[in-house]
Amino acid sequence: LYEALGLGTLPRAARARAAERVLVVSAAYGVLAPDDAVPAHRLSMGTDLPGVGPLAAHWRPHLSPLLEARAAEPGQVVLDCRSAAYAAAWRPSRATAGSVVAVRVFRERATPDGPVRTVVSHDAKRTRGELARHLLLRRRREPDSPEALAAAAAEAFAVELQPAVPGRVRHLDVVLRGEGAA
């Protein structure tokens, strides 16, 4: 995700928006700003550490107050680019779930029986990073609803916003079409 986001190559205004709006969930450090200096490390949120237990469960009580407050801000839409392991560290409450839009990535290919979609796992990080970069580079008004977010994403990607279900997170499906779609 970070490589595709290319934080260091963003224009100054987009970097400032990232510093103000983007939060990074780290298995080692909790919540970080995109430009926080941290030592190189490899630690997945799916890790079960001796004496600590599963990291997602460890971080949940620490992350929830901060992320709930962000999601509860008026006119706030949270674009959730976390993988499933990281999503387990914060599950939006029913009260804030409607302002959270989780990104899923699918590859669609043509078959004789019609289009077939498969979940993209390996390249999903890159696509999420490209989406975040696109949104940071936009010079238009920041999206203030899931529908506005989907419209902004549609400027650069084939997307489908799933219908709202009260108390549930919305899903924005990014659809990569064709065999070579990445």
Language model segments and positions:
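Internal, well-folded beta-alpha domain core
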Residues: L7-A182
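Active-site helix-to-loop segments that bind/position phosphate- or nucleotide-bearing substrates
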Residues: L1-L7
